[in-house]
Swiss-Prot record:
Peptide chain release factor 1 directs the termination of translation in response to the peptide chain termination codons UAG and UAA. It comes from Paracoccus denitrificans (strain Pd 1222). Its main location: cytoplasm. Keywords: Cytoplasm, Methylation, Protein biosynthesis. GO terms for molecular function: translation release factor activity, codon specific. The modification N5-methylglutamine is found at Q229. Residues 279-300 are annotated as: Disordered. The gene is prfA. This is Peptide chain release factor 1. It comes from the Bacteria.
């Protein structure tokens, strides 16, 4: 059975927000009210559809007493009851608790792991993969920091991705990505295994994380390129150290002002993510519903180039379409992970 009391509360809350919007709320309240209203609108539509079908079923049942209408009523009841499970499932999905960060932009961080230069090259391949996927979704992809290796790989990459549902769709990408292939630097044709670490963080606003000025140290320096050479002659690069946690963030684009803003945005995201992770750990029951443990050290995926195979170890998904995947066609993987997480959360609620 669906929780009727909760359905009533949701509809009443939606009607209250609608009345507030029509009355013209204060300027500082408009954004929050509009956001909550937009989130509840599709849920209320699902509730209305479910209630309408329930009413149609009651009317059809009443018609069974009429001998002349009985056959028609039975046909109508069969049709309505056949569609009811799918409708109730959709409503249960709509009622699942939302991750408050799902609608936020995301900060993407990629770093090579074990494997030396080959790991750096693979990190660069992952960066290109996510960039292409973002472009295919119509999202904005902004590089915040990019440090190249000697052979053109990636030592460190940070990007901001903005668009509809960015964090909701990319949050399952955090973890260790392993690659098996013959490196470009390998003359003997032997397959090597290396790895890169991906972190996807929800962007945090200043109101989410309070960072006192006394808690940070800001250093400026010259930006360096591959091999350590200076790419400009001014001290435009910015390094921010968060003293209480030891977190260090660097941004080395051309504008010092922009670098400071970029580095602070990443620092806020990391601190916000730490707080979210801490809260998640305290909700042990909820952790069971997540795809994987959320641990950045967890190996989540293997890319086997000789076999053209990608395997996501968390859900046992294997696709023999590695060329397309590396070109950014990861929608099937993203949707499978989201569906698995959704099913687990529904099961946890006793569906």
């Amino acid at each position: 059975m669906l929780p009727e009391d909760r359905l009533i509360q949701i509809v009443e809350r939606f009607e209250y927000l609608e009345a507030r919007l029509n009355a013209g709320p204060a300027a500082e309240e408009i954004a929050a009210i509009s956001r909550e209203y937009a989130e509840l609108k599709p849920v209320v539509a699902q509730i209305a559809q479910w209630r309408s079908v329930q009413e149609d079923i009651r009317q059809a049942q009443a018609m069974l007493a009429d001998h002349e209408m009985r056959e028609l009523a039975q046909d109508e009841l069969s049709r309505l009851r056949a569609g009811l499970p799918a409708l109730e499932h959709a409503l249960r999905v709509a009622l699942l608790p939302r991750d408050a960060a799902d609608a936020r932009p995301a900060i993407l961080e990629i770093r090579p792991g074990t494997g030396g230069e080959e790991a750096a090259l693979f990190a660069g391949d992952l960066l290109d993969m996510y960039r292409r996927f973002a472009e295919s979704q119509g999202w904005q992809f902004q590089m915040l920091e990019l440090v190249r290796s000697d052979l053109g790989g990636v030592r460190e990459a940070m990007a901001r991705i903005e668009g509809e549902g960015v964090f909701a769709r990319l949050k399952y990408e955090s973890g260790v990505h392993r690659v098996q292939r013959v490196p470009e630097t390998e003359s003997g044709g032997r397959i090597h295994t290396s790895a890169a670490t991906v972190a996807v963080l929800p962007e945090a606003e200043e109101v989410d994380v309070d960072i006192p000025a006394a808690d940070i140290r800001i250093d400026t320096m010259r930006a360096s390129g591959a091999g350590g050479q200076h790419v400009n002659t001014t001290d435009s690069a910015v390094r921010i150290t968060h003293l209480p946690t030891g977190i260090v963030v660097t941004s080395s684009e051309k504008s010092q002002h922009q670098n400071r803003a970029n580095a602070m945005a990443v620092l806020r995201a990391r601190l916000y993510d730490m707080e979210r992770s801490r809260a998640d750990a305290e909700r042990a029951a909820d952790r069971k519903s997540q795809v994987g443990s959320g641990d950045r050290s967890e190996r989540i995926r293997t890319y086997n180039f000789p076999q053209g195979r990608m395997t996501d170890h968390r859900i046992g998904l294997t696709l023999y379409a590695l060329d397309r995947i590396m070109q950014g066609e990861i929608g099937e993987i993203v949707e499978a992970l989201a569906a698995h997480d959704q099913a687990a959360r529904l099961a946890a609620q006793g569906e």
